[in-house]
């Protein structure tokens, strides 16, 4: 029997994947030796994200000569949600507003967002102390659900002071789930902060992202299973932390600025930079983050992406919808004199 010192123990490896707007990057990292075992880059197939992920994983395992059983974790950061908001490419969703008057509905970015997303307003809502102001009236909901059933892929619900008392949001959610199997987002699940218009925007954007992130997660899980990888799947949030794929499946809005967060956290760690800027020029967007005292600076009022102010905790990033994959053309009618479009290869 060999001595303990001569027994070669399998080393745990971590797979990192970034599904960007242009390329999907992946690598195998060994925490024990602090080395990158292998890395690959493949074009992102927007119609079938799973094919890009599958190709990247295959190259990683074969070229890196790593067994699937030695993989301890699969971590994913993605610019998918960020790019979808910048490009206005989220899936259609409907908003149900409870107890919100005209003054509230006309604030912030909500009116613009509702131009292309149907909504219905119900009587109800609570006071700032959580007391019911008006009984919930769901009578307009059934006809509304029938009207939008074929035109949307999800629903968002926001209620007046639902962070103080979520009962009306919960009741409406149950009714929607009884009528349809589409995903439902409650604003009170995304933030405990006041500001109903901002919560409404965050919830509606989340509902628009659910189908996109679902397709991504299904692609990753399908590929890992095909290669025999049983390691947990973790997703990076916009604040640089990792959460489970189940968490992200219902709260994809938490992944906005996930890609830039990964760049900022990585740059801070690798450069030992105390104060500075991190500029990440991708294929679709260019992102600028700030490092102060060795750490990425957080956005105090919530992440802002594509002109939308959200209640998502994230690093402070300035995102422009221009990258190496962008095509710039003269446009006399535009305010800037130019127009941007994307060329996906």
Where are these regions (language model features)?
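N-terminally biased helix-coil "hinge/interface" segments that flank
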Residues: 2-343
């Amino acid at each position: 029997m060999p001595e303990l010192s001569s027994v070669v123990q399998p080393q745990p490896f971590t797979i990192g994947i970034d599904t960007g707007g242009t390329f999907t990057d992946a690598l195998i990292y060994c925490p024990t030796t602090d080395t990158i075992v292998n890395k690959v880059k493949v074009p992102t197939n927007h119609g079938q994200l799973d094919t890009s992920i599958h190709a990247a994983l295959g190259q990683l395992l074969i070229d890196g000569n790593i067994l699937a059983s030695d993989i301890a974790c699969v971590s994913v950061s993605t610019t998918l949600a960020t790019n979808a908001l910048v490009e206005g490419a989220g899936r259609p969703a409907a908003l149900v507003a409870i107890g919100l008057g005209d003054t509230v509905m006309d604030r912030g970015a909500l009116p613009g967002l509702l131009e292309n997303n149907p909504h219905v307003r119900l009587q109800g809502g609570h006071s700032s102390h959580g007391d019911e102001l008006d009984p919930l009236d769901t009578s307009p909901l059934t006809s509304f659900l029938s009207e939008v059933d074929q035109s949307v892929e999800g629903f968002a619900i926001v209620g007046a002071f639902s962070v103080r008392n979520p009962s009306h949001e919960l009741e409406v959610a149950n009714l929607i789930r009884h009528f349809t199997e589409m995903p439902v987002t409650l604003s009170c699940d995304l933030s405990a902060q006041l500001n109903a218009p901002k919560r409404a925007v965050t919830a509606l954007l989340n509902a628009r992202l659910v189908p996109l992130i679902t397709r991504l997660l299904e692609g990753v899980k399908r590929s890992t299973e095909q290669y025999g990888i049983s390691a947990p799947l973790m997703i990076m949030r916009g604040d640089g932390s990792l959460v489970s794929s189940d968490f992200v499946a219902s709260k994809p809005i938490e992944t906005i600025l996930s890609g830039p967060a990964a760049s900022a956290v990585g740059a801070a760690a690798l450069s030992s930079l105390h104060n500075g800027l991190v500029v990440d020029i991708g294929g679709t967007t260019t992102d600028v983050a700030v490092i102060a005292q060795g750490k990425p600076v957080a956005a105090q009022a919530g992440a802002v992406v594509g002109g939308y102010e959200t209640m998502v905790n994230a690093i402070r990033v300035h995102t422009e919808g221009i990258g190496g994959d962008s095509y710039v053309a003269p446009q006399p009618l535009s305010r800037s004199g130019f127009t941007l479009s994307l060329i996906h290869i």
